[in-house]
Structure formats: C-alpha cells, structure tokens
C-alpha cells in the first residue's frame, strides 16, 4: 500500500532523483526558464519554491541550508541577491508551468517551467533532460 507517500518516483532511485532535482533546480535558478517533461516540472516546483521562500530572509543559516540543498555557491548567491528581494512581496507561487506539446521521440508531454517575474527579454530556453 502506498498510503501517505507523496512525490513521484519517475523510474529512478532516491539518490538519482535527488541529484536530478538538485541539478534541475540549479538550472532553473540560473536560467529562470527550462524545458522538461510535465511530471518533472510538477515535481521540480516542490523543490524550487521552498528554496525561494528560504532566500527571502537573508541569514548565514539560511544560506547554509540553501547550499546544502543545491551544492552550488553561484546558485546560492543568485537566490539571496536577486530572487529573494524580487519575490519579497509575493507569498508563494514563484513558478509557472506552461505545457508545450509532446516530445518527438516518445510522445512524452513537455512543459516549460519558469519563474513568474522573469524578464520578457530572455528568449533562450535551456533543455533539462
């Protein structure tokens, strides 16, 4: 029985899943929009939104928590110097998921996940697979 088990397995073991979402969260923070499958985008939302909430209060302890979750000082710096102040007045819902059709090879549903207050001039999209 799978009572009270939240989250998707995505055909990966736990360490692979953790590493994948750590990498995807870093890519999303760095580029502010990535293209991935719809289930991965929905799960990534559960990883990124608490990181941005953490970044709204700048402290050494919060920076260490963010580093423990991302393992990248560049990502931590962007979270606390840019994204935290940008979303200071927003109480949640920092990401948006836009469906974008199906992948050619296996017909998997694809989606863009982006930060909501992203500058419109950034037209490039990074594929995260």
UniProtKB/Swiss-Prot annotation:
SUPFAM superfamilies: Prokaryotic ribosomal protein L17
GO biological process: one example: translation
Keyword Ribonucleoprotein: yes
Alphabetic keyword roster: Ribonucleoprotein, Ribosomal protein
One term of GO molecular function: structural constituent of ribosome
One Pfam family matching this protein: Ribosomal_L17
GO cellular component: cytosolic large ribosomal subunit
Top-level taxon of origin: Bacteria
Similarity section: Belongs to the bacterial ribosomal protein bL17 family.
Cross-referenced PANTHER family: LARGE RIBOSOMAL SUBUNIT PROTEIN BL17M, RIBOSOMAL PROTEIN L17
Subunit structure as annotated in this protein's UniProt entry: Part of the 50S ribosomal subunit. Contacts protein L32.
The protein's name: Large ribosomal subunit protein bL17
Protein source organism: Yersinia enterocolitica serotype O:8 / biotype 1B (strain NCTC 13174 / 8081)
Gene designation per UniProt: rplQ
